[in-house]
């Protein structure tokens, strides 16, 4: 994992996001009655491991700092309480759920251009990714999400680490992945990346991973270290091989 000031990046991003939420039209609405919003995350309610909780805490802090704490209420729903991510992103598109925190890969299911960030080994680090975003790489994706899905990105953030492979045996090269059923996001680009690395890439909803690993339906999973810890996937598979094949960003 790269040594980066993730919390400062998240705080800055959400300051901008809170400013966007607190637009004149919304403030007018908020004066009439408290606006209640829901924020969904697939990960547990634990700021040590779960990026969604960190982003939620910073969002609430900035809403209060803008003097809107009594007018805008944001409720946090961790651990897929509002549904699997693929269902939640469609609910956000329809306006049924207000916000979600997820890797950009989930949005690629409804607006394919977002999947450009999921290309294997596209970035070497999160600082490199941030530099690209600061120089305009994020704008085409933001515009496409707004135009094609009515979804506005209010913040980009670092994930808690690059994605690597957790499996029942160590991975030193493609030969070690040959035929191994490795869970991937339901995203064609990430699935193809793992296939090219030698694995039998197996798309699966996040909430099904633990039992599939436990039952031997899967041989492994690719994810970032804190997600592995928060979800206790290490209880089923003992080898975490730092393939670092993906540095996809988080989006709110």
Give the location of each predicted region:
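N-terminal secretory/targeting leader peptides
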Residues: 2-129, 137, 143-252
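Short, flexible helix/strand-to-coil boundary loops that buttress conserved ligand/catalytic motifs
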Residues: 133
């Amino acid at each position: 994992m790269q040594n980066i000031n993730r919390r400062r990046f998240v705080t800055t991003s959400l300051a901008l996001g809170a400013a966007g939420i607190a637009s004149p039209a919304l403030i007018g609405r908020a004066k009439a009655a408290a606006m209640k919003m829901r924020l969904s995350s697939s990960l547990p309610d634990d700021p040590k491991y779960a990026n969604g909780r960190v982003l939620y805490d910073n969002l609430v802090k900035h809403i209060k700092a803008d003097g809107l704490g009594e007018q805008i209420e944001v409720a946090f729903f961790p651990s897929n309480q509002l549904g699997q991510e693929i269902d939640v992103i469609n609910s956000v598109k329809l306006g049924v759920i207000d916000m979600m925190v997820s890797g950009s890969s989930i949005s690629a299911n409804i607006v394919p251009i977002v999947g450009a960030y999921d290309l294997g080994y596209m970035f070497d680090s999160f600082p490199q990714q941030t530099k690209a975003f600061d120089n305009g790489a994020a704008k085409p994706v933001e515009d496409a999400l707004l135009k094609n899905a009515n979804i506005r990105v209010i913040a980009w953030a670092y994930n808690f680490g690059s994605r690597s492979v957790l499996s029942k045996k160590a991975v030193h090269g493609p030969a070690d992945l040959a035929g191994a059923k490795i869970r991937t996001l339901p995203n064609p680009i990430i699935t193809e990346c793992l296939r090219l690395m030698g694995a039998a890439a197996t798309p699966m909803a996040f909430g099904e991973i633990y039992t599939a690993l436990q039952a031997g339906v899967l041989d492994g999973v690719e994810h970032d270290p804190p997600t592995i810890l928060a979800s206790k996937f290490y209880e089923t598979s003992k080898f975490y091989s730092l393939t670092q094949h993906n540095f996809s960003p988080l989006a709110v």
